[in-house]
Amino acid sequence: CLKDENGHLFDRFRGRVIFPFFSVSGKVTGFAGRLIKQSDKAGKYVNSPTSILYEKKHELYGFYQAKQAIKREDCCYLVEGQLDVIQLVQSGIENVVASGGTALTYPQIRLIHRFTENVTILYDGDNAGIKAALRGLDMMLEEGVNVRVVLLPEGEDPDSFARKHDATEVLEYIKQHQTDFIRFKTK
């Protein structure tokens, strides 16, 4: 709970869709809440406060559900948001996790690296996504991860793209448009 200006308690997640975060062993550790209606007063996302169980920099949305597919496919698709994960999984792509925005962290990279050395960054094609992909590339290379980047068509994010295409089409697009870190950084 939080307090408003008048000292009244209210639920920090009110008016939001709630996404649970799970530990590697499947226990709920925290939540992210996304606004249902856009507001100038409130941030788009709110996370659980940092605790013994939950620290945002260590969390990857969907990791518990994706870890076996990541191991089986020997590849992890890294997206920005929870809705990106949900839509890609619904389209049939299971080896996908979200960093929870564009702020990828070393603990998140190390968690992925425990299950695969191969990561494909599939961030939004906007300026923020491109900048985040560049930062993420350097961090992953420092951690010894083989990293590739896919930029989606302008105006698309993984959620919207997967709504328009089935898994075969999404995977074909990734195959045709993925680029290694050298080519991506020199574009």
Label the model's feature ranges:
Residues 1-115, 119, 133:
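Phosphate-handling DNA/RNA-contact segment within nucleic-acid enzymes
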Residues 83, 104, 123-133, 151, ...:
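Acidic, metal-coordinating catalytic cores used for nucleic-acid/nucleotide bond scission
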Residues 111, 138-145:
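Arginine/glycine-rich "motif VI" loop of SF2 helicases in the C-terminal RecA-like domain
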Residues 144-187:
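C-terminal or mid-to-C-terminal helical accessory/interaction module adjacent to the motor/catalytic core
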Residues 115-123, 167-173:
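Short, structured secondary-structure boundary patches
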Residues 60, 106-109, 113, 129-134, ...:
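Amphipathic alpha-helical transducer elements in NTP-driven molecular machines
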Residues 92-96, 136-139, 164-167:
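Short secondary-structure boundary/capping segments
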